[in-house]
Amino acid sequence: MDYSNFGNSASKKFQDDTLNRVRKEHEEALKKLREENFSSNTSELGNKKHYRAQERMSSPLHRLSPTGKSDDRKVKSPLDDKLRRQLREGNTRLPPPPFSSYGMPPTNRSNLDRIRRRTSSPVRTDKFASQNVIDDQRLEIKYLERIVYDQGTVIDNLTSRITRLESFILNSISDRGDKNFASLEHSRSFSGFPTNKTYGLQMGGLYENDMPYRRSSDNINKEGAREDRSSQIHIENESTEDILKILSSSFHN
């Protein structure tokens, strides 16, 4: 019997058996991890499921390593610099890590918890929720701006209508002249409001011979007796109350 390669063949057979067992465990763990976090059809995506320590496998690197280094449990993270940069730049799903990352002891946080936390991406959900709030606020601001614009349009239309009404009334009074049979009644306490026959009525007040009208004794004598004047003013399509409001506002201005 040739014993020259006995040690090498036995060692190789042991390593093959170990690798086959590790691959089988890795496939089972990978299948379990995909069912939890890498299925886009499940509604449970992102929920944290805590594993017990018995469910974790010991690291295959530790099983294949010499016995003197069993206490050294610090293994490099499966995320290299390229994947970390991609994770920072955009929320992309991470590929399954190499099997050497499985079975890490629960020091601080295990690799499984870290991968599960990053693939579930709760930050992405919060970001989308805040963006929806911002969009709703922008729509509300646009709606309020539209209301303000509509109210401004209504105010402009009312202002233009009032201006046209004032000009129509004042032109009607000044154009009638001798044909106007009406005048406003005034008492001694009132500073005086002349008849349209004697004084021309213009925007902003009363004028006599291109000069502002001022009440005096001459004006009183010029107007004649109080009983000779009518106490109402007649303008087509307008009430006396509206005319008095417009005339009083222009008189005070």
UniProtKB/Swiss-Prot annotation:
Gene: SPC29
Region (Disordered): 1-20, 31-123, 210-231
Coiled coil residues, start to end: none
Protein name: Spindle pole component 29
Residue spans of biased composition, Polar residues class: 1-12
Native organism: Saccharomyces cerevisiae (strain ATCC 204508 / S288c)
Function: Component of the spindle pole body (SPB) required for the proper execution of spindle pole body (SPB) duplication. Links the central plaque component SPC42 to the inner plaque component SPC110.
Modified residues (Phosphoserine): 65
Composition bias type Basic and acidic residues, residue spans: 69-91, 211-231
